[in-house]
Amino acid sequence: MESPDLEPQQRTLDDASAEVVSADEVEFDVETDVLVAGAGGCGLTATLAACEAEDLTVTLLEKSAEVGGNAALSTGMIPAAGTRFQREVGIEEGPADMARDILEKNGHEADAELVEHLCESSVDLVHWLVDDWDISLHLVDDFKYPKHSEYRMHAPPGRNGENLVAEMRDRIEARANAELLTNTPVTKLVAKDGAVEGVVAGSVREEAIRADRVILATDGFAGNREMVRAHCEDDIADALYYGSDGNTGDGIRWGAELGGALASMDAFQGHATVVSGTGALSTYAVVMNGGVLVNADGERFGNESKGYSQFAVDVVRQEGGVAYEIFDERIFERLQGALEDFDRAVDLGSYTSADTVEELAAELGCDPEATREAIESYNAAVEAGEPDEVGREDGRNVLSAPFYGTEVTGSLFHTQGGLVVDEHARVLREDGSTVDGLYAGGGTATGISGHGAAGYLSGNGLTTAMGFGRLAGVHAARSLGEQS
């Protein structure tokens, strides 16, 4: 019988508990040195890092048919401060600048030392991907995401995460000491005396795999509505989920069963501009090049430049959970051909155009006169160089005919809380001790976004996914090398 005084967070974890079995009850079928669970941004990076040790075997298991997870659904942009790509265009900044932006966005609610460590390692991460693994990345220097003080996003071709994960997958498949298996979910962790000794995995037929080190890269729990309702704010719990179906909290539950501490379980990344009719993502570059959002009454309802994650909740709170994105031909032409997400949205017929704001609003379904007044007020503030009626000052440009627009809804992308880890991505207990042999990264680990949606800075997801992934892979391989 459930204890009546059990904390709600623990109750949810217990109710949906993933199984951890004793090594005494398992007969292992195969062995590997490093086992990585989950082939998203974190798992792919961890595998690349670990398999650099050529005398080790590395096994990467993915529950879905395709690799990539949420990284494949993202723009694939990796923030890094102090790279040679920045210096080549005259940008002089360092990790401390990136850390400052992250901490200011999350209200200094994240672990400052961990934030600083990830920012310091971001430079090596980008250079390592490009130089050691021939991953195609370039600096994005034509627009900044909200609250980034400098151009520091390093993007794959097309600014599309599918292209990033495809290259990473190809590099792994070319390694003799690495094995990638899809449609192979990890179903249980195997442990003895609090230390991880392997996993049980498989869909049609399960096998027990002995592993000296296990890296949990199963992302968060945004695809598990029960966990979302238990931990995140009500407004987002029933919002559209725009993420990988495999993100059901498995790794978090396994780690917690072994005594791993949890933090920031209420943190998540939302997105304010998923197109209602087509389900396409209307890139936030539309907004940061001057686009605005109004509600059904034709009124601006908040400062869009505070970020697509935080603004997602504002959109969900509008009538019908929708808003209307208004921009112009200048923005349309600037983004077409530059971002694959935008091109996909265009190809799906996501956008409507008209010669006047009133005509556009009438077609979209928001109040024509009020929308015209909102755009006129916005333009006047831009021309005067003053904050507009919602306090926005960033990413503004005068909007002029012809106009474009679409109906959008707020969505949940992924959660940002999970297992507490150290600077090597090792899972920690409440007393600060490590769970032997166990690592976590990405959405499986505590993120750097503080609480709720407001603390998410663009790129935080891949910062923790790929940053912790590399740290975990390097440490796992190095620690095994020291034992040999």
Regions found by a protein language model. Name each.
Residues A53-L73:
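Glycine-rich FAD pyrophosphate-binding loop
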Residues T32-L60:
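N-terminal Rossmann-like FAD-binding beta1-loop-alpha1 element of flavoenzymes
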Residues I252-W254, G260-C366:
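An anion/pyrophosphate-binding glycine-rich loop and adjacent beta-alpha core
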Residues I209-T273, L462-A465, L471:
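Glycine-rich loop(s) and the adjacent beta-strand/alpha-helix scaffold that form part
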Residues M1-V34, E52-A53, G481-E482:
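Extreme N-terminal leader/targeting segments of oxidoreductases
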Residues R11-T12, A16, L118-A208, G223-M227, ...:
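Conserved redox-cofactor binding core of oxidoreductases
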Residues K188, A370-G452:
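A glycine-rich dinucleotide-binding beta-alpha-beta segment and adjacent secondary-structure elements
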Residues F28-T32, V204-R213:
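Core beta-strand elements of the Rossmann-like FAD/NAD(P) dinucleotide-binding domain
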